């Protein structure tokens, strides 16, 4: 797919095959035109990504990587579960720098003391195990990492999907918590060598075009076709030099929405200056691809042709130019409404036509926030646009969240905050809430434009089960400010004549020195961890049985199922430290009956674990077991497990939160069945929680099973042990109907984790 403008000019063009890049600038498709003795395989070793992965690979096989990261980072939705898992698995000390930020629930007043209890847990763990603790309001996770952690040629693993520091020369990856646990226990991150896709930047952005515009254009061209799925995006080309460090960072953080694995950029003097400004000159490293580098594909981005963009509800890939939307309002809004019928399952009435006022599109809210929008240059540009204007005294509201206190301080000093506030803007502290529904939830049926990372259904905080719906569209800070200056009528920043001051950034290191706890890697075993009453240990989990019987308790036919749908974000996340408490919200917005169904089936497994009869605990099992015993009379006590599974076409897009899998697990989930998995990280989460990542080739519209059916998987343990690619299973009805379930590629360690029942059991067994 390519994105074209009227007149045939390309904003984005995708190459159908692999390409060679000569001297970082010349694109060559035909190997015969490459004047070099290098083979394709040798030239592939000249990518920046290959070099960094090689330096961090602890195995002798570059096709099967075993990666050790330099640093780790987590926020307060995930660090409690990670540390609790690591503690249960033998943690004694953080073996590498591990930063714990508190940027997700620091403003939530849900559940009394539970949020601050988690923060105190984090602080005492940082002291006990030798970590870094960033208090609430000081910085969002990724801005702190950019300012204080990133380094040229380094690798960072974070328990947040937007862990991306490629613009600074750092390969960063976002994964579920169990992958961080492995690093904390001196184990490795095991993956196949990923493909590498060149993102070739050419030209220079027009005045008023920002990083989110470029990012959305790339996402729109690559998400649906999976062009960069689970691959590394490597940014090259002459256009890189025409972008500031902040601009590059703003594009880079959004690469997650393409479903890529990681990103890396060539670096130059502008990145050196970034490190100099932050007092870390020694962490800069010049990075460039080799003279002849081979890539598995190439995305050509003509920066000069990028226009102000908007990602309409309910996905970052649902992109249009703002001019295109304004010129075709009724048609595009109707198309969005039709797509929403699928996303929302008809749970509420959804219409955008009432947003058209006097032929213009009116929005009720604008927000610039978080790791994507809250950067210094974004907010300075917004202040330049709105200076001397005002947002009006009607429905429209405008909020800005600087991504860190050092940024906030500099914006105060240079007058940008005053310009914003005078215009009616509300300026708040560093907080991720607008990105995931923990603050600034719009009114019912309201429309919000945001420079944040995602606009999935209900991610802004509305509750379908209460009959609520509001919408978020993603835009760049500049066009959001232009819309604010126009009192809520959608306006691209290029439509305004603005003098951008281009103010220089100064970093005040004393802000963090005064407030951030840094152990400098020194652990203090004498410190007692503070446990609030909501912080619970993980429940015991059984090993994979010889034979497995699972009931399908949810069936989702959307093209993609997000992790937000599997476990909602927002205020729900306050219960993140209580596995069973959080699980009560699993699939609550997508399939409210899921939890009840799963818990009902779980009664049988609990009976088995108590050495009681599962049929007595769950009467509906009797005819199911009778049918199984006709063919498999030996199946029963001591060799059978009973639980639940869900089917989804393509689950796992979005967040790295492990809770999308662990909540299913603690409710008795043994497996997922999918046509494919949206991301590597969600599949890894399933595996690390001992769940079978089954796949079926059968189209979702003609499945051999349905919600409520039981599926019997005989000798499943043997199949995993013997590395079977296809597992025989049976849908239990009037007869046993045979089906094939694929397991996909699994490492030996992943197989053992599944056999042991979860990562915690695996490490306990290997002590």
Label for each model-derived stretch:
Residues 2-767:
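Fe-S-dependent hydro-lyases/dehydratases of central metabolism
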């Amino acid at each position: 797919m390519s994105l074209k403008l009227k007149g045939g000019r390309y904003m984005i063009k995708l190459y159908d095959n692999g390409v060679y890049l000569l001297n970082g600038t010349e694109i060559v498709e035909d190997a015969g035109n490459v004047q070099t003795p290098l083979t394709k395989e040798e030239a592939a070793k000249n990518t920046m990504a290959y070099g960094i992965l090689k330096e961090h690979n602890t195995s002798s096989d570059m096709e099967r990587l075993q990666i050790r990261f330099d640093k780790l980072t987590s926020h307060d939705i995930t660090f409690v579960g990670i540390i609790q898992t690591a503690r249960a698995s033998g943690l004694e000390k953080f073996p590498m720098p591990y930063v714990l930020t508190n940027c997700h629930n620091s403003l939530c007043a849900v559940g009394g003391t539970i949020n601050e209890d988690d923060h105190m847990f984090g602080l005492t763990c940082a002291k006990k195990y030798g970590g870094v603790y960033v208090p609430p309001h000081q910085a969002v996770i990724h801005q702190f990492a950019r300012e204080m952690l990133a380094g040229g040629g380094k690798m960072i693993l974070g328990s947040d999907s937007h862990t991306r520091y490629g613009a600074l020369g750092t390969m960063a990856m976002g994964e579920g918590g169990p992958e961080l646990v492995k690093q904390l226990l001196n184990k490795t991150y095991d993956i196949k060598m990923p493909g590498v896709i060149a993102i070739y930047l050419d030209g220079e952005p027009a005045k008023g075009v920002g990083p989110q515009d470029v990012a959305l254009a790339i996402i729109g061209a690559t998400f649906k076709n999976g062009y960069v799925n689970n691959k590394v995006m490597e940014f090259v080309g002459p256009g890189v030099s025409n972008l500031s460090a902040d601009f590059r960072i703003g594009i880079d953080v959004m690469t997650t929405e393409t479903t890529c694995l990681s990103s890396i950029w060539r670096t130059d003097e502008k990145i050196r200056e970034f490190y100099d400004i932050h007092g870390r000159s020694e962490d800069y490293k010049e990075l460039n691809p080799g003279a002849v580098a081979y890539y598995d594909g190439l995305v050509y981005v003509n920066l000069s042709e990028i226009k102000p963009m908007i990602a309409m509800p309910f996905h970052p890939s649902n992109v249009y130019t703002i001019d295109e939307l304004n010129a075709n309002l009724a048609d595009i809004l109707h198309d969005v409404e039709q797509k929403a019928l699928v996303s929302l399952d008809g749970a509420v009435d959804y219409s955008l036509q009432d947003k058209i006022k006097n032929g213009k599109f009116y929005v009720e809210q604008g927000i610039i926030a978080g790791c994507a929008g809250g950067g210094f240059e974004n907010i300075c540009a917004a202040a330049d646009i709105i200076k001397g204007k005002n947002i009006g005294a009607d429905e429209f509201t405008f909020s800005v969240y600087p991504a860190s206190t050092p940024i906030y301080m500099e914006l105060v000093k240079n007058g940008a905050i005053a310009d914003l506030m005078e215009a009616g803007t509300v300026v708040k502290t560093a907080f991720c809430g607008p990105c995931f529904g923990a603050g600034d939830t719009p009114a019912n049926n309201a429309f919000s434009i945001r420079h944040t990372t995602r606009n999935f259904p209900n991610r802004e905080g509305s509750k379908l089960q209460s009959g609520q719906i509001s919408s978020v569209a993603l835009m760049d800070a500049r066009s959001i400010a232009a819309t604010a200056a126009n009192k809520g009528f959608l306006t691209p920043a290029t439509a305004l004549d603005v003098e951008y001051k281009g103010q220089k950034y100064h970093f005040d290191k004393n802000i963090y020195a005064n407030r951030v706890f840094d152990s400098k890697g020194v652990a203090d075993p004498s410190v007692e961890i503070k446990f609030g009453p909501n912080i619970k240990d993980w429940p015991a989990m059984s090993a994979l049985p010889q034979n497995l019987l699972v009931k399908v308790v949810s069936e989702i036919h959307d093209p993609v199922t997000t992790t937000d749908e599997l476990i909602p974000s927002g205020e729900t996340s306050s219960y993140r430290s209580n596995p069973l408490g959080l699980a009560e919200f699993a699939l609550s917005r997508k399939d409210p009956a899921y939890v009840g169904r799963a818990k009902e089936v779980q009664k049988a497994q609990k009976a088995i674990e108590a050495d009681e009869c599962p049929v007595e605990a769950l009467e509906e099992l009797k005819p199911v077991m009778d049918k199984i015993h006709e063919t498999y009379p030996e199946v029963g006590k001591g060799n059978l497990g009973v639980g639940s599974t869900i089917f989804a076409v393509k689950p796992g897009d979005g967040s790295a939160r492990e809770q999308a899998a662990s909540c299913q697990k603690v409710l008795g989930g043994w497996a997922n069945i999918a046509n494919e998995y949206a991301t590597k990280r969600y599949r890894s989460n399933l595996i690390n929680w001992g769940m079978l990542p089954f796949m079926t080739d059968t189209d979702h519209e003609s499945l051999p099973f349905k919600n409520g059916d039981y599926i019997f998987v005989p000798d499943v343990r043997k199949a995993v042990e013997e590395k079977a690619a296809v597992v025989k299973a049976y849908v239990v009805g009037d007869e046993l109907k045979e089906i094939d379930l694929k397991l996909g590629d699994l490492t030996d360690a992943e197989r053992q984790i599944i056999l042991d029942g979860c990562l915690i059991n695996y490490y306990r067994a290997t002590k």
